[in-house]
Amino acid sequence: MENSDRYNIFLIGNNPQEISTMESNLSKYHRMDFIADVGFDLRDSLSKVFKQKPNYILLDDCYPLIQVRRFIQRIRNNRQTEEIPIALLKSSNRHVRIDGIQDFFLKDNFSADRLFHGIKNSRKIRRTQIVLYRLNKKRRRQYQNLKYSIKNLFSG
């Protein structure tokens, strides 16, 4: 985790009652000091994420899938926010594949302890994804250069 005992979580959802319940659960957690910030609109939340750079984003699945994907893509395309792990808070166990999500939590089973362990795992997963992505990008570039060199060698 971090060296500090404080961990900034950004909660995004459209139900103030659910969000405040989660925020309350996090504030009572004894193993870590969670500081929760809240967003209800994806567009406003995106600008807050860019300004505050939280340690973790917990996103409710209440938004349309296309908006969620766009939100995640904007975070992943920004060098300053690409490492922030994102978890989806789901109301059902229905499988939905969304690139850029490191973890899922069911609303019925949500607890600060599960979040704590999810954060530890998600940070490792996200860092590994970034390393693999960069290595893959580098190898593709090397392959293209090699292909171009071989083509020039035999065509000239």
Task: Give the role of each language-model region.
Residues 4, 12-37:
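Two-component/phosphorelay signaling modules centered on CheY-like receiver
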Residues 101, 112-127:
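Receiver (REC) domain switch/output surface
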Residues 124, 130-156:
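C-terminal output/effector regions of signal-responsive regulators
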Residues 7:
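Nucleotide donor/acceptor-binding cores
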Residues 37-38, 85-90:
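Short, hydrophobic beta-strand segments that form beta-sheet elements in well-ordered domains
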Residues 19-20, 41-45, 50-77, 90-92:
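Conserved phosphotransfer microenvironments
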Residues 32, 53-55, 79-85:
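His-Asp phosphorelay/catalytic-motif detector in bacterial-type signaling
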Residues 70, 89-109, 113:
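Alpha4 helix (beta4-alpha4-beta5 surface) of REC/receiver domains from two-component response regulators
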